[in-house]
């Protein structure tokens, strides 16, 4: 799925638009953005909300502050997420205080490469989530992450590959 016309023109993607929704094996999927305002670039990212029982994950793609504010205005408290994939890898153009307040994430995942050239996530963004009280996870430091979910109680553990599969040279017993 893609929100930007340029990606759609290449023919390998389907359009995503706010309001699209489906259910699969008791899990609800809902597209929250882009709407019909003609967003481009990062702000045309598909924003996907995934929910099952008391668990909700929000996957906002590369949206920036302008789209975060539009989502807060439109969805308010229904943006609350047990797990939040940090918008735009935690760049300084995203994760505004109001967005953090309304998403109220228990866990935040920063998806970025180790020593990436963009310096994602931005230290100020990490600090905002830390002050909010969210548990933070960095793919650059952890390797892939796996979230264990119980639909009745929400997210359980977030498991790091490097913690569950340490190499013999890591020096951990």
Short names for language-model regions:
Residues 1-173:
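Non-globular, low-confidence helical/coil segments that flank catalytic cores
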